[in-house]
């Protein structure tokens, strides 16, 4: 698995330490183990997890501005856990409303000895953080309008929303509240992943 991950990282031009590579492998092994009992992801093959969960999360990293982020609807910690592993100086809150997902994330944080990731069991509309975030991340929302409607209270005044999407559909933009504007649409390249991936940055 290590050789495969090293190859994927090289193709994506992502440079990280040997320790971080090992943490990512350990994360996949943990997810694979828990998945058999708790059905956390439809991806069953650890090699496939490297592409669809790890690399698909990591390619967002260069575009994150700031130090404090929240991953909303994180599921089993995606993209938040991989991003926390390779960005030890940034803080990540991982929010989900399903207990089994947060239990997995707590276990992963403990096993991987991560000090910059905090799991929160809550519905997003009920979560009221003491401090707002530089960035609100999500792979979970069906539309940009849903993301901004549910998460409007989370970013700082100059904070960003980072939506990870498949195909970029312009009609989603027309549904947005006029107070939000698209800052960037970035076509992401994920090695060995079939299909389009985009990062939409708005505020």
Swiss-Prot record:
* Pfam families attached to this UniProt entry: GidB (PF02527)
Sorted alphabetically, the Gene Ontology cellular component annotations on this record are:
cytosol
For this protein, the Enzyme Commission number is: 2.1.1.170
Q: Where does S-adenosyl-L-methionine bind?
A: 73, 78, 124-125, 139
Q: Which cysteines are joined by disulfide bonds?
A: none
Query: Where does this one sit in the cell?
Result: Cytoplasm
Q: What Gene Ontology terms describe what this protein does at the molecular function level?
A: rRNA (guanine-N7-)-methyltransferase activity
Reactions accelerated catalytically: guanosine(527) in 16S rRNA + S-adenosyl-L-methionine = N(7)-methylguanosine(527) in 16S rRNA + S-adenosyl-L-homocysteine
Keywords associated with the record? Cytoplasm, Methyltransferase, rRNA processing, S-adenosyl-L-methionine, Transferase
Q: What InterPro entries does this protein map onto?
A: rRNA_ssu_MeTfrase_G, SAM-dependent_MTases_sf
List the Gene3D superfamilies. Answer: Vaccinia Virus protein VP39
Would the keyword rRNA processing turn up in this protein's UniProt record?
yes
Top class in the EC scheme: transferase
**Family label:** Belongs to the methyltransferase superfamily. RNA methyltransferase RsmG family.
Q: What does this protein do?
A: Specifically methylates the N7 position of guanine in position 527 of 16S rRNA.
> What is the protein's name according to its record?
Ribosomal RNA small subunit methyltransferase G
């Amino acid at each position: 698995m290590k050789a495969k991950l090293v190859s994927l990282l090289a193709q994506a031009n992502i440079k990280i330490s040997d320790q971080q590579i090992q943490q990512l492998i350990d994360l996949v092994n943990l997810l694979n183990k828990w998945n058999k009992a708790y059905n956390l992801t439809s991806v069953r093959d650890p090699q496939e997890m490297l592409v669809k969960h790890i690399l698909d999360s990591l390619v967002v990293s260069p575009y994150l501005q700031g130090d404090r982020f929240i991953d909303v609807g994180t599921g089993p910690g995606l993209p938040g856990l991989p991003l926390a592993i390779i960005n030890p100086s940034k803080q990540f809150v991982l929010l989900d409303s399903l207990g089994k997902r947060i239990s997995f994330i707590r276990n992963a944080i403990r096993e991987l000895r991560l000090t910059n990731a905090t799991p929160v069991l809550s519905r997003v509309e009920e979560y009221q953080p003491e401090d707002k975030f530089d960035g609100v991340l999500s792979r979970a929302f069906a539309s940009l309008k849903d993301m901004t409607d549910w998460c409007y209270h989370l970013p700082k005044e100059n904070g960003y929303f980072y939506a990870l999407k498949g195909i970029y559909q312009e009609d989603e933009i027309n549904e947005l509240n006029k107070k939000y504007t698209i800052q960037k649409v970035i076509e992401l390249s994920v090695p060995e992943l079939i299909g389009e991936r985009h990062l939409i940055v708005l505020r």
